[in-house]
């Protein structure tokens, strides 16, 4: 990291013009490798995340030598024809270069972010990076709104548009040419920006960080004008969050847009005045909610479609944006089924000798666990069948008993940790039951005995260790309600340390 800082200090005024030489620096690939290790999931192996023990400085040096010999443009072609290189998978070179790309391409944005906060007091916003931080916002805002726009974020007609947008931020022509070559090589860019991306292991495992950066940059471009319009029409102060990559240097983008679009949009801002408009994005979708009328939502819908198609050349269709009444739908996002439903209550009011009973209905946000998709994920991972019946895990029978229990325990704790905000815990208990019995059947299969006899011989306490830990943590956090396990099971808990959805929860 010190070498990278010294390189950038050589010419701070032109750091954007000298990104290409960084591809020949070994420490860049070491940084990418370290990033992959720190972002791994506790119960997923490094091989699943494609940051395994096969990484070595020798492979990096061989790669750099081949690039010095002007062969970097044919590395991917040759590498795709060879099944392995020194015992590695056939996509090793392309994976390593894309990881280096991901580190280098973030440098200009990181430098602007640091410079924008020089001399300013930066507030700690680490909690904003948590996925669960979205739900308290929904609990506070959504219950007062009427309509919602479900938007499937459009993607560029051609990936050349992404390169053209990056030219405004990166001036290195050689680096951009090589970037263009990468995008031509991975021509199925569209599959990454849709929900089918989950089936494409190339993007998810081998080039995760590189394409995630490009996707965030693409979304940032599509959102920039919308946020600018909202600020101009509502006269509200916008704040940037350093926890999200696409929010980087938002103020600088606004200053640029003020000059370009001041005259064009001044006459139409009055069409969209709505002080109760809220917007948030998750995965490949976004949601706009409002307290306004359906007519106002239709204006936003067709305005966004025309803006994306005419200005950004994004492929979009009106049927990709759905207008719904908030009280009549379930929002399926971030692994939860969320809905706003009236919560009736009876209030007894007594004035002198007269008593009145008043029925009050207050909207409440309900967050449910989607049982069918989650059981489908468990069935895909071979923990149960499609009907939800627990089955053994034959692939794990070669491990020690303690390792098997530990792996099941970590999965169970991760699921409980993520779905601790559910309004109804019965579905979560069913998932725990599936994992508990699957663990017992795996151990019984290993020892060639039945589940009943195995549990009778060893007792059921050996399985309770990883199933009770979550309740112990909640009792420590909320000591006032720890005495009542029934009340504890009804409490919704949102954690601020969840920064990603793992494969089991990516619904």
From Swiss-Prot:
Subcellular locations according to the entry: Plastid, Chloroplast
Cellular component, GO annotation: chloroplast
InterPro entries reported in the protein's UniProt record: Domain_X, Maturase_MatK, Maturase_MatK_N
GO terms under biological process: mRNA processing; RNA splicing; tRNA processing
UniProt KW keywords: Chloroplast, mRNA processing, Plastid, RNA-binding, tRNA processing
Statement: the UniProt record of this protein carries the keyword Amino-acid biosynthesis: no
GO molecular function, a single term: RNA binding
Family: Belongs to the intron maturase 2 family. MatK subfamily.
HAMAP family: MatK (MF_01390)
Function: Usually encoded in the trnK tRNA gene intron. Probably assists in splicing its own and other chloroplast group II introns.
Protein name: Maturase K
Gene this protein is translated from: matK
């Amino acid at each position: 990291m010190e070498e990278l800082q010294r390189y950038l200090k050589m010419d701070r005024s032109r750091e954007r013009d000298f990104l290409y030489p960084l591809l020949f620096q070994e420490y860049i690939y070491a940084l990418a490798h370290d990033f992959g290790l720190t972002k791994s999931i506790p119960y997923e192996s490094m091989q699943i995340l494609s940051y395994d023990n096969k990484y070595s400085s020798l492979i990096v040096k061989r790669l750099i030598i081949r690039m010095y010999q002007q062969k970097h443009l044919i590395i991917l072609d040759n590498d795709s024809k060879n099944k392995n290189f020194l015992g590695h998978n056939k996509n090793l070179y392309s994976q390593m270069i894309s990881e280096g790309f991901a580190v280098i391409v973030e440098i200009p944005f990181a430098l602007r972010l640091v410079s924008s906060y020089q001399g300013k007091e930066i507030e700690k916003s680490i909690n904003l990076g948590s996925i669960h931080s979205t739900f308290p916002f929904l609990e506070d805002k959504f219950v007062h709104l009427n309509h919602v726009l479900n938007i499937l974020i459009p993607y560029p007609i051609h990936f050349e548009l992404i390169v053209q947008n990056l030219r405004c931020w990166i001036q290195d022509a050689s680096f951009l040419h090589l970037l263009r070559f990468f995008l031509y090589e991975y021509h199925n860019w569209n599959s990454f920006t849709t929900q089918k991306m989950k089936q494409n292991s190339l993007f998810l495992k081998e080039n995760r960080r590189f394409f995630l950066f490009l996707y965030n940059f693409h979304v940032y471009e599509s959102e920039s004008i919308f946020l600018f319009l909202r600020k101009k029409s509502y006269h509200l102060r916008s704040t940037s969050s350093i926890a999200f990559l696409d929010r980087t240097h938002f103020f600088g983008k606004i200053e640029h847009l003020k000059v370009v679009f001041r005259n064009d949009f001044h006459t139409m801002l009055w069409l969209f005045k709505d002080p109760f408009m809220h917007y948030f994005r998750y995965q490949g979708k976004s949601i706009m909610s409002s307290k306004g009328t359906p007519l106002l939502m239709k204006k936003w819908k067709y305005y966004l479609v025309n803006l994306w198609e005419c200005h950004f050349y994004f492929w979009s269709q009106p049927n990709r944006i759905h207008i719904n009444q908030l009280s009549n739908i379930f929002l399926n996002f971030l692994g939860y089924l969320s809905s706003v439903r009236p919560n009736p209550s009876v209030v007894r009011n007594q004035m002198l000798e007269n008593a009145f009973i008043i029925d009050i209905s207050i909207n409440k946000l309900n967050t449910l666990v989607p049982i069918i998709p989650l059981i489908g994920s468990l069935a895909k991972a071979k923990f149960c069948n499609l009907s939800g019946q627990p089955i053994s895990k034959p692939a794990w029978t070669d491990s020690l008993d303690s390792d098997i229990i530990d792996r099941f325990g970590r999965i169970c704790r991760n699921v409980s940790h993520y779905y601790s905000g559910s309004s109804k815990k019965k579905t979560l208990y069913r998932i725990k039951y599936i994992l508990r019995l699957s663990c017992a059947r795996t151990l019984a299969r290993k020892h060639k005995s039945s589940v009943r006899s195995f549990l009778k011989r060893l007792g059921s306490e050996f399985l309770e260790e990883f199933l009770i830990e979550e309740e112990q943590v909640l009792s420590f956090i909320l000591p006032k309600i720890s005495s009542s396990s029934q009340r504890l099971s009804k409490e919704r808990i949102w954690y601020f340390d969840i920064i990603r959805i793992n494969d089991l929860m990516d619904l």
